[in-house]
Amino acid sequence: MEKIYKIIYSQWQKEVIAYIANKAKHKGKAASCVIKKGGFYPLFFFLNVVIVVIEKLITRNKQEAGDERMPKQSTTEVEKSVRTEDEIYHNIDILVNKSHEALAQMDDFSQEDVDKLCQVIEKVGEDNARYLAQMAVDETGRGKVEDKVTKNTYAAQTIWESMKDMKTVGVIEEDKQEGLMKIAEPIGVIAGVTPVTNPTSTVIFKAMIAMKSKNTIIFGFHPQAQKCCVETAKLIKEATVAAGAPENWIQWIEHPSLTATTALMNNPKVQIVLATGGPGMVKAAYSTGKPALGVGPGNGPSYIEKTADIEQSVNDIVLSKTFDNGMICASENSVVVDKEVYDQVKEAFLKRHCYFLKADEIKLFEEHFIDPRRGTVAGPMAGKSAVKIAEMCGVTVPADTQVIVAEYSGVGPKYPLSAEKLSPVFTLYKAENSAQAFKICTDLLNYGGRGHTAGIHTQNSKVIRKFAFAMSACRILVNSPAALGGIGGVYNNMMPSLTLGTGSYGANSVSHNITAKDLLNIKTVAMRRKPIL
């Protein structure tokens, strides 16, 4: 009982003091003033009474047991925890103020100035693609160096090529005949949140679109990828500042924590949040009360219809699932196959070193591969190789195994492997017909992937159209690997991006691949014309 009392006592004391201190800070008053004049006095008084009672219970317990091994938390320790949180908020304020100063210095930048600096970022990304890829793999223990080189190059070269002719400064469109003119202005200070799965490439991408739209950016890096992300941002900063950019147009949180990232996203002087991460982080971004562009979870299905080119379809899926060990969120998490070609598809996967789990091995994966609290892949397994994941789950597979496949029948909490996997693992379903295939794909999207991506392999244009209308996904990929198809610009003509909107399906504000234009305020000048009655 004493332990329970002490935990409650310590936690309440911290939270009450922190709550009042933060309220006082945001109101610009002393904590005592907030307690007396605000609406917190009754709550504070009540909790203090409770704390006193708990203190007495602890003391009495110790006297009865004669146990002095659990000293009370000192007032100094409590004050220190509050002060530390205050320091975090203060440091964020400093970063944001510096960012606004840089924003003002960029006010006179022309389209040519901005494009020149974007080209500098492109060169940094290309020249350091391998160095940063190796650093990311070494730090996070996830993915493949060669594939991260490709992603860094994509974030630099492909992204720049896609938007180099995009007008983002000043007058971007004028129609004299219609009497309309559009003027672009930067949104302001961006809070850029990055994931552990695609760390360095996301930094390059977000820095590029921030500069292209003449905004400043402050990054909150994932703690498990802090070093490689800081190095990426430093290289970009050094090169762009040398080329004429303001010193603080790009900054980052030096000591990452959930508190610091939350403080950044909620800072009143930050204009927009650009968040890439798990569903919790994206939800937090959308709860800030300001514009936010977030990326929801994937869990995308891929349907191999009976008229599909089997060899190409299987090649595409294996390529997609092995690329950076399946960490692009658009990659196939499940494959649904028409019964007429199921055996042929399975044989094709086996030829490409895909290991099919036995019934008892599926149970081991259900127990170890999926985090029961979150209902998705366990963190330590995301982005690991198929062989390593099997080992972690207690399953022995051949050393040349590329992908792990679980033949499955259901979707939802009772079928753990039907969730998002972010690794070279997928579930395989047999469908009696296209109607059942559509139903399975829809169920998979509804179980953690709404709005993201769905793929189909077929030669039947009518089926493609029906599939597109039926799926609650913002990207419908036809006859292509989903990982590289979803990001655009490689296997299709979608806008290249490393931030993929999922629309209202996934509680996102946009449904397309995010670009620099999403970071602009666009004003419309409308000339008078004769009124139409």
Identify the role of each PLM range:
Residues 3-28:
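N-terminal, intrinsically disordered charge-dense segments
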Residues 11, 24-46, 65-66:
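Positively charged N-terminal leader segments that act as targeting/secretion signals
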Residues 39, 46-69:
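Short, Lys/Arg-enriched N-terminal segments with co-localized hydrophobic residues
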Residues 60, 66-181, 209, 351:
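N-terminal Rossmann-like NAD(P)+-binding subdomain of aldehyde/semialdehyde dehydrogenases
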Residues 67-72, 80-81, 107, 395-533:
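Conserved C-terminal structural/oligomerization subdomain of aldehyde/semialdehyde dehydrogenase
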Residues 77-82, 86-89, 204, 282-412:
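ALDH superfamily catalytic-core signature
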Residues 171-312:
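Rossmann-like NAD(P) dinucleotide-binding subdomain of oxidoreductase/dehydrogenase enzymes
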Residues 214, 273, 338, 389, ...:
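Residue-level signal for inorganic ion chemistry
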